[in-house]
Amino acid sequence: MAAFADLDLRAGSDLKALRGLVETAAHLGYSVVAINHIVDFKEKKREIEKPIAVSELFTTLPIVQGKSRPIKILTRLTIIVTDPAHCNVLRATSSRVRLYDIVAVFPKTEKLFHVACTHLDVDLVCITVTEKLPFYFKRPPVNVAIERGLGFELVYGPAIRDATMRRYTISNALNLMQICKGKNVILSSAAERPLEIRGPYDVANLGLLFGLSENDGKAAVSTNCRAVFLHGETRKTAFGIISTVKKPRPSEADDESLPVCKKAKCEG
């Protein structure tokens, strides 16, 4: 099986608390984690900050439980979009956005969900779990997102903390599974404290409550997560690629512009 991953450890101003989250994840057997910086443009003067450098957290990375290698720490940016204008930062080649390994979008309306699935250059689409779903999922945009290699993220942290959130999480997850059939789904903790992280096998079992099959539940904490950060690598690389088009030689261009009958005479 691919390495286990939790792609949503919440970044805060307290580096000591963040170190505790990463250490706990390593102890539970996660090989990869992502530190998630969330930007909500509804709040005044919110800007995309530079991601936290791994060197700020650790001089020596924690070793993954049961492995001989250190944990891998990725950086993630999640942008909450409530207005189409908020998507502009994702359409442009923003230098700050490019600094992050994973870029996620949290659409709050059906229209924005459709745009996220079909057009935005992101790696993850976040699904709300803290309130009743404000719209119904439709198959066309979900299928386009799957074809584009985007992941759908469900977080289990709120379901652990609150009974009402648990109902919302399960209900919204089941609605998603009816459409995507478990494809490209990842499960993350959204943990702010170490006690909110669960072991990968427990999370995979939790996926059964969300409508995932046993195999899809395991993939949601392993292979699907790997696909997400590989998608991020491809996205970042694509920014640096300049495509070139071979121009035809003048004689070739002239030949192409001639009618077929005249070309035949010339060749004769």
Swiss-Prot record:
The modification N-acetylalanine is found at residue 2. One of its GO terms (cellular component) is nucleolus. One of its GO terms (biological process) is rRNA processing. One of its GO terms (molecular function) is ribonuclease P RNA binding. Component of ribonuclease P, a ribonucleoprotein complex that generates mature tRNA molecules by cleaving their 5'-ends. Also a component of the MRP ribonuclease complex, which cleaves pre-rRNA sequences. Belongs to the eukaryotic/archaeal RNase P protein component 3 family. This is Ribonuclease P protein subunit p30. It comes from Mus musculus (Mouse).
